[in-house]
């Protein structure tokens, strides 16, 4: 929906499959965009295409995130956190360093971005955090990722309680498997949805009137059975997921 008034959206993780879909959906809805991602070349290309301001940095870099936000003369109406990494293995084989890396990318950066954004979020604004169904259905081999997403969900609930009286909504978008490069190595009993579907959900949330509070939207693709074809199953995360699915199928 094209809005009559100028609106601004900050998207963190803008060059990933989901982040890029969110950027395109909000651009189509008439938003001025502030884009952030770690990979400078694709970020620069996307920003040029969408006429956006951008900052190439990690989502944990509060200084650069604040500088990007500072370019929005009239504040921010929508904040989308879609950054993250899917990395790791079963706990016996996963280092503490890898655990810390996953938590930093998927959880700590959420707080950094929200903390940097809040002074500039307009009344009636919405903070949208892209979570995952693994937050409530943790998967073997994804201990750090599942813990990070569960932490994001708890953070969102606490933030919503704090900010609702200020006229700022906090919403979680929790998709099942999405067809993105990050998910290509995993296996699931549910069909993967295109990233554009997540972008559509985010744009729909952004278009809602502020009086509508939507704490969480959870969705997935259609069920396709306990066995699924896997790409890159030899990888530690993919192999662990495949083993878990096979074990579950054998018990039913």
Regions found by a protein language model. Give the residues of each.
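Conserved glycine-rich cofactor-binding loop
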Residues: 15-16
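C-terminal helical subdomain
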Residues: 172, 187-232
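Conserved glycine-rich Rossmann-like NAD(P)H-binding loop of the short-chain dehydrogenase/reductase
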Residues: 31-46
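Substrate-binding pocket helix/loop in short-chain dehydrogenase/reductase
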Residues: 90-91, 95-103
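Active-site helix of classical SDR
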Residues: 114, 148
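Residue(s) in the substrate-gating loop at a strand-loop-helix junction
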Residues: 132
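Rossmann-fold cofactor-recognition segment
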Residues: 49-63
């Amino acid at each position: 929906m094209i809005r009559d008034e100028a609106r601004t959206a900050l998207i963190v993780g803008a060059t990933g499959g989901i982040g890029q879909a969110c950027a395109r959906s909000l651009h189509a809805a008439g938003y001025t965009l502030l884009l952030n991602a770690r990979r400078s070349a694709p970020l620069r290309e996307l920003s040029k295409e969408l006429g956006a301001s951008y900052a190439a940095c990690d989502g944990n870099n509060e200084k650069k995130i604040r500088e990007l936000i500072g370019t929005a003369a009239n504040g921010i109406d929508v904040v989308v956190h879609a950054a993250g990494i899917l990395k790791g293995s079963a706990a016996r084989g996963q280092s503490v360093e890898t655990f810390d890396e996953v938590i930093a990318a998927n959880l700590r950066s959420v707080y950094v971005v929200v903390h940097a954004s809040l002074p500039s979020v307009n009344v009636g604004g919405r903070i949208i955090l892209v979570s995952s169904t693994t937050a409530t259905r943790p998967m073997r081999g994804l201990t750090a990722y599942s813990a990070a997403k569960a932490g994001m969900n708890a953070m969102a609930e606490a933030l919503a309680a704090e900010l609702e009286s200020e006229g700022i909504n906090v919403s979680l978008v929790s998709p099942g498997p999405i067809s993105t490069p990050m998910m290509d190595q995993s296996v699931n009993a549910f069909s993967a949805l295109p990233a554009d579907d997540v972008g559509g959900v985010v744009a729909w949330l952004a278009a809602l009137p502020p009086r509508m509070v939507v704490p969480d939207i959870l969705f997935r693709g259609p069920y396709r059975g306990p066995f699924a074809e896997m790409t890159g199953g030899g990888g530690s995360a993919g192999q662990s997921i495949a083993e878990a699915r096979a074990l579950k199928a054998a018990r039913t």
